[in-house]
Amino acid sequence: MNNSQQWQAANTARAALYRWFAELFARELTKTNLTQLQAQYPSLHAAFSDLNLEPQSAALQTALENLQVIPAPDRALELAADFAHLFLLSGHQSAPPYASYYLESDQMLYGKPAQQMSEFLASHKLDLHPEFREPKDHLSIYLQVMSLWIKSSVDEQANLIEMAVQQQHFLEDALLSWLPKFAARCQHIRVKTQVYPAIIDLLLHFVQEDRQALEDMAEAE
């Protein structure tokens, strides 16, 4: 199997992982969602370990296991409180998951990054979930975009090298331009559990690894 065939095979997993992250940041985990996450995480941990993310994934696995000290009926509630404290409070108290907050000097939402994402979605004919009504520069939308973009490139059998270059530039310019600042801010906010801090750290390293893989893919041809 040559490099192009290997990368094509990897794209299905890439799309699934970006979608998984997007869903985690879109809304709070319900009790059912949390049960599913805990049940499926051993297989996800194996996948992340294969991507050189074993330390970051192990931290999330430990954080999920440590939820056992919280009474079962309260676990999802505690995580919902962490979600709200991290992402939903006013900017000086939380880490808003919007690019504009980190890239615009006035830290106002609906800034230039939101406009750029709206234009990107229109030009690439990517349809997001209609019930997700956050500003277009919400972190979950960037992750949804990557998932849909990867899937469409597989379905349409797009030129893999050209697509790798485009996706590399998207990650560099649209996401990694502010994701490290967001991740660092999250780590300084006190929360009850370490689940979301671990998810955020895993996401940052995943995106960085994916960007590097895209660069390596383009340079190998």
Swiss-Prot record:
Keywords: Chaperone, Cytoplasm. The gene is torD. One of its GO terms (cellular component) is cytoplasm. PANTHER family: CHAPERONE PROTEIN TORD, CHAPERONE PROTEIN YCDY. InterPro entries: Chaperone_TorD, DMSO/NO3_reduct_chaperone, HscB_C_sf, TorD-like_sf, TorD/DmsD_chaperones. It comes from Psychrobacter sp. (strain PRwf-1). GO terms for biological process: protein complex oligomerization; protein folding. Gene3D superfamilies: 1.20.120.1820, HscB, C-terminal domain. It comes from the Bacteria. The keyword Cytoplasm applies. Belongs to the TorD/DmsD family. TorD subfamily. It is found in: Cytoplasm. Involved in the biogenesis of TorA. Acts on TorA before the insertion of the molybdenum cofactor and, as a result, probably favors a conformation of the apoenzyme that is competent for acquiring the cofactor. The keyword Glycoprotein does not apply. This is Chaperone protein TorD.
